[in-house]
Design a protein with these regions (language model features):
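A generic structural signal for tightly packed, nonpolar segments enriched in small/aliphatic residues
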Residues: 1-132
Length: 132
């Protein structure tokens, strides 16, 4: 693939870090992350980049497997993204942690209370703006 983008309600840790309205962004490619931030700005689906802190790879090491899918309580959003990064190979990749804004607790300017569909506008905009 040219790029890989995944969106998931992967951890509650991102909600703790960013609250209920921001999408957490992780990735290994600055240009792809910039496209996602621009699409978020254009659509009102706010994206905030968090680090893929490679020192935390230690937290997902395992004695019985290649690695484990949780690194414990601290840095949970980062270790979850590090876990995902193990499966993308050499491809440009971004992970959108949508756990916070996936459910709107109140009406917001572009999203009514309830299931938000967050990420759809952002991804459609990114694809629409992608150079051909």
């Amino acid at each position: 693939p040219d790029v890989i983008v995944d969106a998931a309600t992967l951890t509650g840790a991102c909600v703790v870090a960013l609250g209920p309205e921001l999408i957490g962004l992780f990735g290994n490619d600055d240009a792809l992350k910039a496209r996602l931030r621009a699409a978020g700005d254009a659509t009102g689906e706010a994206v905030w980049e968090l680090p893929l802190w490679r020192d935390y790879d230690e937290l997902i090491k395992s004695d019985i497997a290649d690695f484990k899918n949780t690194g414990g309580r601290e840095g949970g959003a980062i270790t979850a993204a590090l876990f995902l990064s193990k499966f993308v190979g050499p491809h440009p990749w971004a992970h959108l942690d949508i756990a916070g804004p996936v459910w709107a607790k109140k009406d917001r300017p572009i999203i009514p209370k309830g299931a938000s569909g967050v990420g759809v506008r952002l991804l459609v905009r990114m694809l629409r703006d992608w150079p051909t």
